[in-house]
Amino acid sequence: MFLLLPFGIIILVAALIIIFKAIKIVPESRVYIIEKLGKYDQSLSSGLNFINPFFDRVARVVSLKEQVVDFPPQPVITKDNATMQIDTIIYFQITDPKLYTYGIERPISAIENLTATTLRNIIGDMTVDQTLTSRDVINTNMRVELDEATDPWGIKVNRVELKSIIPPADIRSAMEKEMKAEREKRANILEAQAKRESAILVAEGEKQAAILRAE
C-alpha cells in the first residue's frame, strides 16, 4: 500500500504536467502556429485551446495588431539623375498567419527589400521637383504596390509614409538661397508697404493741419 503511494503521486504529477502542456491560452490579437511532427497542423486563435503535448509544438506566435517598421534612409536616383536620401515608414498587419510563417523567409527583411525596390522604381520616373512636391502621391503608389506584392505573404500594407526626403547638397544649397531670396523679397515688400502707409498718414496729417490753419 505504502509502496504504491509514491508511484501514484508520480503518475498524478505526470498527468498534471501533460494536461498543463496540452493547454494553450492564446492572448487577444495573437495566433499560435502549431506544428505536428515538424509539419504545419493548425492555427490557434485567442482563447482556451488544447494540443497534443507529445506531437504538437508552438512553432510561432504571430501578432495580428498593426505593426510599424521604420526603415533607414536609402539613396534613390531621380529621373534627372539626382540622388535623394529617403527613409520610409510602413504600417502593416498580418492577415494570414500561416502564409506569414511559411510563405517567405524573414518577412520583415523581405518587406524592406521590396520597399527599396518599389521606391527606386517610383522615384526613377520622377524629377527632383516632382519628388519634393508629390509626397502624398508617392505614399499612395507605394502602399498600393507593396500591398499587392505582400498579399501572397499574408500581409496587408495599410499605410506608407515618407518620413524625410533629403536632396543632394547642391540642390539643398540652391533651395536655401531661393528661400532666402523669397524671404528678403517679402521683407522688402512689407517694408515698402509700411513706408507707403506711413507716407499716406503723414500726408493726411499735413492735409488736416492745412485745413485747420485755413479755418
Q: What name fits each language-model region?
A:
Residues V62-E215:
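Elongated, amphipathic alpha-helices that form coiled-coils and helical stalk/scaffold elements used
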Residues M1-P75, Y100, I104, E112, ...:
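Interfacial loop/beta elements and low-complexity acidic/Ser/Thr-rich segments
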